[in-house]
Amino acid sequence: MTPEERRNELLDIGAELFATRPYDEVLMEDVAERAGVSRALLYRYFPGKGELFAAIYRHAAEQLLDLSRVDPAVPLEEAVSAGLDAHIDYFAANRCTVLTANRTLCGDPVIQAIINDELSALRARMLDACCLAGRQRDVASAALHAWLVFVRVMCLEWLETQNFDRGEVRSVCLRTLLAALAAAEDCHATSVADPLERKL
């Protein structure tokens, strides 16, 4: 097994453990045992549990971005749906991983950088698909940023409470996206029509 193959194997095993156990209950010894390697070898690839988790979460973020391509040739709601479904599916299958990143390690700068980088990439793709320019693009950019944070919070609430189902999460998120973009367009139209507001 090449070093890259070994590393990928360790990531896969770690991902399985973090997906089903709280962060504090995942031990590096368990990862090494499942992989059939010594702890010393595991630590050569990942100096600690934090580094292992960060590598797993970064890999997941990259995969989700690959599944979240936005085609400007189709309506935005349709273009976004596939990426939203991919994220919801990942959250459902990796509940403990997502809660670890957003709750247990919410103050970890490495994890937060991974989350912020993904959100920034998603916003840029969606914004480009809107084909806007100037001030209207700036308003839509802020609206999309707010929407992406909303989706994150909505999914975390769903994972933690289970007070609503996946279909409701999806429906609310898509409806909120359309409302946010419509509001951004309305604000732009109002600003253009109101000379006093333009001066302000």
Locations of regions flagged by a protein language model:
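Amphipathic alpha-helical packing segments from all-alpha helical-bundle domains
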Residues: 109-134, 141-149, 153, 168-182
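Amphipathic alpha-helical segments used for helix-helix packing
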Residues: 90-112, 116, 125-127, 153-160, ...
